[in-house]
Amino acid sequence: MENREDLNSILPYLPLVIRSSSLYWPPRVVEALKAMSEGPSHSQVDSGEVLRQAIFDMRRSLSFSTLEPSASNGYAFLFDELIDEKESKRWFDEIIPALASLLLQFPSLLEVHFQNADNIVSGIKTGLRLLNSQQAGIVFLSQELIGALLACSFFCLFPDDNRGAKHLPVINFDHLFASLYISYSQSQESKIRCIMHYFERFCSCVPIGIVSFERKITAAPDADFWSKSDVSLCAFKVHSFGLIEDQPDNALEVDFANKYLGGGSLSRGCVQEEIRFMINPELIAGMLFLPRMDDNEAIEIVGAERFSCYTGYASSFRFAGEYIDKKAMDPFKRRRTRIVAIDALCTPKMRHFKDICLLREINKALCGFLNCSKAWEHQNIFMDEGDNEIQLVRNGRDSGLLRTETTASHRTPLNDVEMNREKPANNLIRDFYVEGVDNEDHEDDGVATGNWGCGVFGGDPELKATIQWLAASQTRRPFISYYTFGVEALRNLDQVTKWILSHKWTVGDLWNMMLEYSAQRLYKQTSVGFFSWLLPSLATTNKAIQPP
């Protein structure tokens, strides 16, 4: 165990110690967890106030810094004042002991994870590790192990002093509870209720599936690549109502992400990304080991189970009870839910119309939407002697789209049969785990998305819709399902996309038109929205949304 590179990379961010090839909790933490596992008659943990003290004592045993008083007070506020006495008693009689028992198993769950990590896919690293920026790779975690990780977060048992230096998001729940105490809101309480419901479901029946977390990287194409693209535009489905997570098409679902995965999920945030992390809490596990995304990176998560229903958005968000996820499993026991996190530029204002910003956004979407099965279908694979990369080339030239490290030996070009024996690693892993199985299951997946980078991020909805359409088309996605959420600026989206498709425009055609429009906006030569500029015959002219 001590010689495992993956374990050594993540161990500084875990509350465990390693001795004689085994993982352990410190003795005093074991004592506290054992007492809690036997119920309040042994541990005396029968209120939020006592739970707060138990968390304080365990963190002190781990030599961690003291939590802010507001965080500790948040636990007491929730369990002693907000929820009713019957629910509170159930938590201290049943859920807290079950979570403590789960944490006692945490070291052995991790050991089993690392024992199995090298056998999931031949030649591919899948063990829990820090996936640093510009380090493409994938991690497979069992839902049971994820439950233990989130239990650590609930009890604030992850070391947090060293996370900032690695640009890692927060992972403990202290800020979540502090926000509840400092400035109570029903939406914040509902976020916590989603997580409570997850733990209640987990403790009643431990799930047996797998969730994968992948950092994807592309070498970003330049503007000339996009201008000259002759790829046809994919189909475009407009939905004025409905939610991305309810899409029926088995499409890739877009998380309008912060560059720090999860954004404000574990603090006060309550918009699209944060809501998704509350109703699919297993997504939070990625915040442990995935540092912030660079401009050429995306994070794809496959298999996260949904546990909660909800209503509302932002301040009106409310927990609405149980959700039973009926998604089928793939050959790796992952639910067929694929979520990709891509972060847009924040408050771009007029910068949004500059070529460099448009290029940044389209390449970010390209990385997120890349469907490896389609990429391989149209490419040949070469391995260069003496370097550590697989390169995708098309028509004998480097496409500039993808590069990634591999653990396979360097050799001459691989044919399709050889490719099944020597699997490509990291960001080209997806869809190539099992020859003819995962490929076929996902080769026709579209993209389900919406107003990415708009709202609080300040992006232009018409340009952002166009950018995502271009990226989806370039990556050979068969369609986009676009959820407008009733945004007025997109009322003509269906009409415009149908007109463009009827004229058989290519990716390059639409990209060049968008560049021309953006230049006119920058130089104040037009004040109308992109769609009205493109189609002056629209019944009602869209006045351009003025950047704040």
UniProtKB/Swiss-Prot annotation:
GO BP, sorted A to Z: carbohydrate metabolic process; defense response to fungus; DNA damage response; regulation of DNA repair; response to osmotic stress; response to oxidative stress; response to water deprivation; rhythmic process
Superkingdom to which the source organism belongs: Eukaryota
Annotated phenotype, changing residue 262 to E: In tej; loss of function
E.C. number(s) listed in UniProt: 3.2.1.143
Function field: Poly(ADP-ribose) synthesized after DNA damage is only present transiently and is rapidly degraded by poly(ADP-ribose) glycohydrolase. Involved in establishing period length of the circadian oscillator. May regulate post-translational poly(ADP-ribosyl)ation of an oscillator component.
Stated family: Belongs to the poly(ADP-ribose) glycohydrolase family.
Protein name: Poly(ADP-ribose) glycohydrolase 1
Native species: Arabidopsis thaliana
Gene behind this protein: PARG1
